[in-house]
Structure formats: C-alpha cells, structure tokens
C-alpha cells in the first residue's frame, strides 16, 4: 500500500505492502500476469509474438483515473495496459488486446498488457502510487533501460509528442534498445549512468527521471543526472533494492538511509510504496527536484 514518510523515514511501505490494486484508479487484482519474468529486462525482442486477447471474451478497456496514458483491461481479472504505439508488434512477448469501434472509436486500437512481475513501474502503480509524472508529451530520462520491457511501455505513455532517453551500460542489451528506437520515440544511449557528462549532448532538460539501477551508489547516480538534466520542479521515480545497497541491514533501515541521501541533494521525496508481492525488499520512491516555491498572491 502507499507508504508515507513518518517516523524513521522508511514509511509504511516497508515489508507488508499488501497485494495492491490499482490505487484509486480501478478494481482489484490483476493476477500474477504470467510468471515472475526477469527483473528489469525480460527476454529479447519478441518480434510479432505475444498473441492478441479479447477474441472470445468480452473485454473493456478504461483509462486509469490517476495515470494519463495508463489503461485498465477489465475481464475475468483486471490488468494494466498501455496503448500500443506500434500495433501488431509485441516487444517482449506480452499479450495484446485489439478493440474496434464497439467502444466508440472510429479506428481499431491495440493495447499491450503490462506485467507487474516484469516491470517495477507497473508494480508501483499496482501498489497505489499516486503519480508517475510520465504523461503524454513528457520527456523522460530512463536510467537502466535493460532490454526495454518498461522503456517500451513508457514510450507508449509519452506518445509521439514525447521522448524517452534510455541509458543502458551493457552493449549487448543496448542493441535491443537500438532496434526498438526504429519504431518508437526512444533515444538509446549505451553509457555508464555514473558519468552523465558523456551523454550530455544527447539529452535535453527533461520532465522526469526514472531509475532502475541496482547499485550501492544509486542515490548519487540519480543526483548527478538530476543536476545535469532535470528541470527545477521536475520529478523522479527511483526503484530501491535494499539488498543491493546493504544486505546486512533490514530493508526499512536501508531505504530510510537512501531517502536521507536524496534529501541532501535537493531530491525531495513525496511518496513511497513497497513492491510486495511482486518484488521482495524493494520500494519505489517518487519525488521532486528543487521544488519551485509557489508565490504568495
């Protein structure tokens, strides 16, 4: 469930987490969505795989009440999905739902199911985070792009008017991002996120930074990139894996320490959610960089 920033900094998002729903934006559930998958990445490519759903059963797709660009597929179980920018093509073997004019549209639309066991951003939405700050037209710097599972969904969110700048250290994995960028608004950057000046000519000022880099110094990496690319009042979303930072301490203690580091670098935390049951000892923190003070009228 949504955690706060009460005593101890770790908030209530700690170990309980609950099964999560869709926050205030829809029904329960979502099920397991096809197994645990593989952390950030998932398998390569996917090509035209994945298959289409909704052929026999009645499926209704509704916009999420809290997150622009995110939809809820209502069938036997409710699932998150995004509007596929490239209809007919699956990125990582995900299921697709094709709907026609029966829901009031003139053209057919295709939605891609968003599996919370393969995307920490999706699991944060299931857990009830109130905003991810990646709506249509947004410019997003994505640190830790991996094979592009979540990157592809973020590109659906920002749409053709937005852009995703995806940084990934691995050259082998980066090839998948390069291939994906041929069809989606993605700028693939194969570099080390610790050195943002190496890609300063490729990234403009952005509206939001999403970070999924499991490193002990991830708070410092986020701060360096925020100083280089995040506009004042811009937002960040960071996935914190406690065991990767300090496996000798309890997860809430580690997360509280990371929050303090963020605050020192003017990265003010706004909310925190636990990713249970999708990920153990993980939390997602949403915050704002150098918040702009509202002028008094």
From Swiss-Prot:
Keyword flag Zinc: no
Entry EC no(s): 2.1.1.-
EC class name: transferase
Stored InterPro entries: Fibrillarin, Fibrillarin_CS, SAM-dependent_MTases_sf
Span list, region Disordered: 1-56
Record's subcellular location: Nucleus, Nucleolus
The keyword Nucleus belongs to this UniProt entry's keyword annotation: yes
GO cellular component annotations of the record: nucleolus; ribonucleoprotein complex
SMART domains: Fibrillarin (SM01206)
Post-translational changes noted in the entry: By homology to other fibrillarins, some or all of the N-terminal domain arginines are modified to asymmetric dimethylarginine (DMA).
GO biological process, one term: rRNA processing
Keywords: Methylation, Methyltransferase, Nucleus, Ribonucleoprotein, RNA-binding, rRNA processing, S-adenosyl-L-methionine, Transferase
Gene Ontology molecular function: methyltransferase activity; RNA binding
SUPFAM superfamilies in UniProt: S-adenosyl-L-methionine-dependent methyltransferases
Reaction equation(s) it catalyzes: L-glutaminyl-[histone H2A] + S-adenosyl-L-methionine = N(5)-methyl-L-glutaminyl-[histone H2A] + S-adenosyl-L-homocysteine + H(+)
Record: residues binding S-adenosyl-L-methionine: 149-150, 168-169, 192-193, 212-215
UniProt modified residues of type Asymmetric dimethylarginine: 2, 7, 12, 16, 19, 24, 28, 32, 36, 40, 44, 48, 52
Subunit structure comment from the entry: Component of box C/D small nucleolar ribonucleoprotein (snoRNP) particles. It is associated with the U3, U8 and U13 small nuclear RNAs.
UniProt function note: S-adenosyl-L-methionine-dependent methyltransferase that has the ability to methylate both RNAs and proteins. Involved in pre-rRNA processing. Utilizes the methyl donor S-adenosyl-L-methionine to catalyze the site-specific 2'-hydroxyl methylation of ribose moieties in pre-ribosomal RNA. Site specificity is provided by a guide RNA that base pairs with the substrate. Methylation occurs at a characteristic distance from the sequence involved in base pairing with the guide RNA.
Similarity section: Belongs to the methyltransferase superfamily. Fibrillarin family.
Record protein name field: rRNA 2'-O-methyltransferase fibrillarin
Organism whose genome encodes this protein: Leishmania major
């Amino acid at each position: 469930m949504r955690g706060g920033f009460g005593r101890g900094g770790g908030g209530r998002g700690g170990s309980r987490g609950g099964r999560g729903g869709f926050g205030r934006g829809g029904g329960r559930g979502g099920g397991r969505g096809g197994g645990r998958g593989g952390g950030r990445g998932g398998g390569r490519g996917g090509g035209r795989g994945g298959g289409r759903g909704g052929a026999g059963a009645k499926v209704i797709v509704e916009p999420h009440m809290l997150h622009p660009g995110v939809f809820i597929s209502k069938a036997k179980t409710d699932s998150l999905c995004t509007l596929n920018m490239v209809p007919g093509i699956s990125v990582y073997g995900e299921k697709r739902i094709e709907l026609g004019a029966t829901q009031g549209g003139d053209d057919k639309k295709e939605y891609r199911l968003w599996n919370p066991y393969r995307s920490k951003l999706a699991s944060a939405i299931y857990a009830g985070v109130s905003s991810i700050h990646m709506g249509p037209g947004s410019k997003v710097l994505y640190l830790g792009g991996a094979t592009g599972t979540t990157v592809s969904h973020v590109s659906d969110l920002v749409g053709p008017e937005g852009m995703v700048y995806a940084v990934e250290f691995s050259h082998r994995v980066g090839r998948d991002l390069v291939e994906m960028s041929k069809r989606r608004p993605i700028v693939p950057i194969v570099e080390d996120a610790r050195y943002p000046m190496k890609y300063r000519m490729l990234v403009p000022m952005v509206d939001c930074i999403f970070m999924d880099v499991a490193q002990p110094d991830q708070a410092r990496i986020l701060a360096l990139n925020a100083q280089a690319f995040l506009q004042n009042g811009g937002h960040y979303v960071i996935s914190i894996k406690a065991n990767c930072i300090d496996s000798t301490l309890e997860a809430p203690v580690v997360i509280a320490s990371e929050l303090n580091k963020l605050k020192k670098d003017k990265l003010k935390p706004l909310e925190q959610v636990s990713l249970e049951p999708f990920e153990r000892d993980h939390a997602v923190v949403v915050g704002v960089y150098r918040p702009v003070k509202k002028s008094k009228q």
